Amino acid sequence: MFKSGSGSLKRSGSISSVKSFSGDSEKGLPPISRGSVSIASQNSEPLIVPASSSSFAATSDFVPEKTKSEGNLKNKSSVITGNFGSSGPTNAHYNQNANGDRLAENLLLKESSKGRGSSTPDARHTATDSRLSQEVKQPFSEENASGNDLNTGRGSHGTGDGVEQYYKFDCEEGMSAYHKRVVDTFFKYFEYPAEDGHSTLYSDVMFLSGGGDLGLLVMSRYQEVMTLRLRSAIYGIFCYLQALTAYLTYFSAKVGQAVMLDEELEKYEIRLDVAQDDDPIVFQITTGVFTSGVAHDLRKLTQILETFSLER
């Protein structure tokens, strides 16, 4: 269980429209739709890298929303925004075997073809790219072939130890084989030694959740993986964004923000605001202290966000 950091998942009202993400003949995922992601800085300075290194636009017209006074909040903030709304009706006959594999493959190939910022791909990365691109092509088992209803009727799981037990044993059942493969593939893809000799400290995050269907989507089965595989605080963001963007399309995610809380400590807060009808949901994560490699790590983050948005 996580021991440091903080995070929260809040929701008002209820969400009753989510039934399954398994894509069987009666219940299914909506089609993946295209979106856009941009990076802006209040003080007109690009948050990450020159335009030549990324297709993200650096702008200065962002007016940060009012925030609570917490920590050492500076007068500088940056924001990452994206429109991940679904562009079409739900496809009740979504073909995971074909479309799911193709999406995962495209994400991997696009990311590997773009390179890794200022770093140079080595033999280990090349071998990893090849191995993983083959891995996502492997045939799916018959697991979840009949679909999984997220409304399992297992009752309230509350908070504290009950949450940990619930997520560890039940959430895996609410995920399709396709979702497991895509997330696992990205975990493996980013599992490589930190570059430039910077520290690989990862700040754990404690989730406070009201439970229900949304809880399944956020935590899934990767609680223990996050502390074992992710090599730095920024990779924690990779984990949450990858898992969430795969599911938040269903809820028509409107905006994601990365707000600098402390300039000297390079402390950020990541928020994803989602709206399903009139039922707003806020996912908030405080990463803690970044290391001296924050510029390199944030450059990686832009590449991943770009990949997600372009494939929607």
From Swiss-Prot:
It comes from the Viruses. Residues 1-23 have a biased composition (Low complexity). Residues 1-37, 62-97, 112-159 are annotated as: Disordered. It is found in: Host cytoplasm. Residues 74-97, 135-154 have a biased composition (Polar residues). Residues 63-73, 122-134 have a biased composition (Basic and acidic residues). Keywords: Host cytoplasm. GO terms for cellular component: host cell cytoplasm. Constituent of viral factories. Belongs to the phytoreovirus non-structural protein Pns12A family. This is Non-structural protein 12A. It comes from Rice dwarf virus (isolate O).
